């Protein structure tokens, strides 16, 4: 870029930046510095000369073009750099390919020697000649094939039991404290409690089902090794897993010595089988005898042997924690106790069995009285529902069913009396183990006693109550609907008429009472009948809504004093009904009265002040110019004042002081009336 003008002296001439045509010269120009100088000169006001003095004024269009050209120059620089980088990379890649093609022959020679060295090294790592030990082979059926779906949980009883040789003061991690030296393995697990065998089988599944005789013998040895740790524990392994493993049933095959066929027992073919059923933890075999895991010393190794309460234990004694007792527990216990002592009353009938007959007789008598009256249909339906579909009792109190002792009054049909028997009745036990009999399939068979039907009776009674309430609600709705049918029909017809009238009213133009009043007055002035016309002639050929609007406007005109209504044939002023045959007439009053009333309506006059004032001199008002329009209004004011004055003179006050003052006021009032009359005479 070049500078225009003398660049040696700064103050004589201003340097202006001009674009360079040569691309090589653009690399040497510091464009940012030039622009900063140019902007500084513009802001300082140095560019203020004329062209005659040799200074060029500021040309903003030229400056904008200069900026645009500088952007293009920079973009060209970036493009040149990009092309240069691409060509350099291409040259380097071609040179590398040539070097690789030349070096392939040398690499082949070097690789052959390298392979020989690798073969020599592989001979050192060859282990095919080493014999394989069969004992070191892992069981693939347990360890390799199956993978646990969750983390392994340690056995619950792998803890120190009471009575073990545990030194609490020393190291608690010794093997002797956990009795690991005296226990045996069961399916690769150390068991301190035989009940944990169920958890082991559940964890491993049925993977041992297809194993050979060795695993079977191992399973049969469980019977001997289950109680090895209990001997030293002093019977402290009594804790059962019944609470933890509820729903688990252990069905064992008949062990030799317990079943009837001891010779046919094969220990190597049938390992103990553990199944998961929902029958609880069953410790009995299928022959009714108790299962004994030990061989001879069953009494010594009994895990369920109770502890000696007088033998002190070696574990640390923890203090008892205070627990808040919930009130609900005590309340439920007391409630159950009270219900057992005092049975609940039945919904139908007395509690005491001695009063049942009397209650039945009263019930039949009341039914006879009701039967004498007219029973509605819904009452008959309800009575049939209460009686279970049978007819009600007769007048003599006899029921349709012959059995009176086992039936209730509310259940004359097939419903039995479920609350008849007391809790002390030995003939009808509620829950007795002797009642249960086993059928051929092994299921418990219950006899159909009345005591077992209490739940069914409650269900039946609740169903009856529900049906009664539903029937009552249904009948009430039917009665309401019957009453509301006529009213609903009338309301619907009225609603239709009103909606039609409202739609018609919306189509009519808005009501202007002044416009309708002007129409009536215009008709009365045009007629030649002396400003008197009947209302039927005025409303001839008019619609209903127009007649109603005109009548309301007529009433407003009467109130304003523009027109007057004449009632022919009514001298006594009694109320009469005027029709089109016998109409009333409308008389138009003076036109100027109507105009004055209009003016009075639009501009209401102020209320005239009372002339009775204290401490003021009553002077006559100043004379005014004559105005014919204000004569009537002034006469009205005068009459109003006179009436007020007369009213004040007649008024009586209870106080004597006010009477004396009233006499002096009467004199002033008389003088004021005289002055008002004189002023009116002058007008």
From Swiss-Prot:
Family: Belongs to the CND2 H2 (condensin-2 subunit 2) family.
Quaternary structure, from the entry: Component of the condensin-2 complex.
Tissue: Expressed in seedlings, roots, stems, leaves, flower buds and flowers.
Summary of the function given for this chain in its UniProt record: Regulatory subunit of the condensin-2 complex, a complex that seems to provide chromosomes with an additional level of organization and rigidity and in establishing mitotic chromosome architecture. The condensin-2 complex plays a role in DNA damage repair or in protecting the genome from certain genotoxic stressors (e.g. boron excess, zeocin and aphidicolin).
GO biological process: chromosome condensation; DNA damage response; positive regulation of DNA repair
KO phenotype (gene knockout): Enhanced sensitivity to excess boron (B), to zeocin, which induces DNA double-strand breaks (DSBs), and to aphidicolin, which blocks DNA replication, probably due to the accumulation of DSBs. Reduced root length, especially in the presence of genotoxic stressors, with twisted shape, ectopic lateral root formation and dense root hairs, as well as short meristematic zones.
Keywords noted in UniProt: Chromosome, DNA condensation, Nucleus
InterPro entries named in the record: CNDH2_C, H2_M, H2_N, Ncaph2, ScpA-like_C
Bias (Polar residues): 101-114, 238-251, 260-270
Keyword field contains Repressor: no
Ranges where the record places region Disordered: 96-119, 210-310, 392-412, 593-636, 649-683
Intracellular or extracellular location(s): Nucleus, Nucleolus; Chromosome
Residue ranges with Basic residues bias: 214-226
Comp. bias regions, Basic and acidic residues: 401-412
Name of the protein in question: Condensin-2 complex subunit H2
Organism: Arabidopsis thaliana
Induction: By boron excess (B).
GO cellular component: condensed chromosome; nucleolus
């Amino acid at each position: 870029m070049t500078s225009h003008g003398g660049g040696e002296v700064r103050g004589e001439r201003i340097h202006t930046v001009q674009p360079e045509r040569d691309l090589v010269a653009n690399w040497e120009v510091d464009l940012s510095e030039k622009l900063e100088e140019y902007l500084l000169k513009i802001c300082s006001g140095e560019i203020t000369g004329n062209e005659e003095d040799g200074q060029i004024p500021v040309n903003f269009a030229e400056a904008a073009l200069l900026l645009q050209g500088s952007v293009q120059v920079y973009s060209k620089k970036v493009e040149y750099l990009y092309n240069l980088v691409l060509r350099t990379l291409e040259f380097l890649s071609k040179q590398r390919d040539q070097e690789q093609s030349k070096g392939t022959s040398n690499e082949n020679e070097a690789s052959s020697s390298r392979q020989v060295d690798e073969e020599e090294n592989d001979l050192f790592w060859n282990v095919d000649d080493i014999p394989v030990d069969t004992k070191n082979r892992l069981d693939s059926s347990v360890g390799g094939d199956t993978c646990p779906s969750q983390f392994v949980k340690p056995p619950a009883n792998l803890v120190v039991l009471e009575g073990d040789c545990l030194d609490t003061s020393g190291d608690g991690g010794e093997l002797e404290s956990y009795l690991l030296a005296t226990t045996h393995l069961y399916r690769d697990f150390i068991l301190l409690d035989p009940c944990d065998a169920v958890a082991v089988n559940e964890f491993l599944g049925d993977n041992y089902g297809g194993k050979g005789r060795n695993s079977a013998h191992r399973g049969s040895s469980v019977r001997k090794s289950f109680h090895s740790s209990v001997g030293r524990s002093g019977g402290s392994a009594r804790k059962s897993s019944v609470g933890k493993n509820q729903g688990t049933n252990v069905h064992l095959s008949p062990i030799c010595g317990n079943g009837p066929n001891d010779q046919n027992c094969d220990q190597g073919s049938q390992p103990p089988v553990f199944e998961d059923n929902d029958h609880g933890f069953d410790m009995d075999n299928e022959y009714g005898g108790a299962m004994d895991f030990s061989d001879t010393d069953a009494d010594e190794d009994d895990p369920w042997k109770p502890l000696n309460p007088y033998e002190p234990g070696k574990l640390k004694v923890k203090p008892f924690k205070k627990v808040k007792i919930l009130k609900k527990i005590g309340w439920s216990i007391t409630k159950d106790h009270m219900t057992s002592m005092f049975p609940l009353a039945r919904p139908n009938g007395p509690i005491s069995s001695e009063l049942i007959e009397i209650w039945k007789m009263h019930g039949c008598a009341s039914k006879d009285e009701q039967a004498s009256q007219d029973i509605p249909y819904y009452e008959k339906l309800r009575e049939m529902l209460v009686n279970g579909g049978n007819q009600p009792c007769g007048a003599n109190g006899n029921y349709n069913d012959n059995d009176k002792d086992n039936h209730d009054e509310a259940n004359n049909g097939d419903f039995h009396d479920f609350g008849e028997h007391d809790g002390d009745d030995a003939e009808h036990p509620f829950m007795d183990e002797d009642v249960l009999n086993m059928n051929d399939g092994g299921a418990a068979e219950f006899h159909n006693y009345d005591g077992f039907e209490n739940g069914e009776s409650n269900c039946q009674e609740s169903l009856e109550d529900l049906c009664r309430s539903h029937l009552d609600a249904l009948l009430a709705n039917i009665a309401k609907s019957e009453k509301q049918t006529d009213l609903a029909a009338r309301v619907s017809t009225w609603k239709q008429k009103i909606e039609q009238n409202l739609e018609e009213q919306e189509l009519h133009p808005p009501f202007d009472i002044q416009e309708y009043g002007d129409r009536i007055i215009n008709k009365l002035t045009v007629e030649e009948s002396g400003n008197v016309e009947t209302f039927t002639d005025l409303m001839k050929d008019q619609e209903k809504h127009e007649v109603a609007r005109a009548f309301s406007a007529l009433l407003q005109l009467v109130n304003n004093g523009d027109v007057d209504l004449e009632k022919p044939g009514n001298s006594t002023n009694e109320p009469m009904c005027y029709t089109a045959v016998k109409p009333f007439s409308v008389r138009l009053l003076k036109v100027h009265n109507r105009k004055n009333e209009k003016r009075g309506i639009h501009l209401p006059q102020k209320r005239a002040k009372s002339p009775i004032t204290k401490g003021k001199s009553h002077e006559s008002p100043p004379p005014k110019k004559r105005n014919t329009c204000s004569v009537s209004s002034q006469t009205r004011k005068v009459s109003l004042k006179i009436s007020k004055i007369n009213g004040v003179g007649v008024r009586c006050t209870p106080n004597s002081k006010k009477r004396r003052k009233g006499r002096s006021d009467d004199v002033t009032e008389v003088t004021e009336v005289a002055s008002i009359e004189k002023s009116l005479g002058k007008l």
